[in-house]
Regions:
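Acidic, glycine-rich flexible loop segments
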Residues: 56
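Axial heme c-ligation environment in periplasmic c-type cytochrome domains
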Residues: 33, 42-53, 66-96
Length: 102
């Protein structure tokens, strides 16, 4: 039982570190200027985005494309600017994966 608890505790620490790294990447990439993790700023809260697309198998590809190209009309009238090429493709994928995990 102690071994199982140790494994669970280790996994929790690793996942928390991964989430912190993803949030730091979102901050560095400028995402948090318009989005909050828990609350709407100019754009939707990341947790709301994750909830909207939960169970959608194509969500990651859709959101990566939306983050790269920008767009409007999905979450209100405020357009989201294109984020490519200034944010690397692999960083966009990492951020989207994190948002969908919230």
């Amino acid at each position: 039982m102690k071994f199982l608890l140790a494994i669970i505790a280790t996994a929790a620490v690793l996942l928390a570190g991964q989430a912190s790294a993803s949030e730091a990447l979102a901050q560095k990439s400028g995402c948090l200027a318009c989005h909050g993790v828990d609350k709407k700023v100019l754009g939707p809260a990341f947790k709301d985005v994750g909830a909207k697309y939960k169970g959608d198998k194509g969500a990651e590809a859709k959101l990566v494309a939306k983050v790269k190209a920008g767009g409007s009309g999905v979450w209100g009238p405020m357009p989201m600017p294109a984020n490519s090429p200034q944010v690397k493709d692999e960083d966009i994928k990492s951020i989207v994966h994190w948002v969908l995990s919230l």
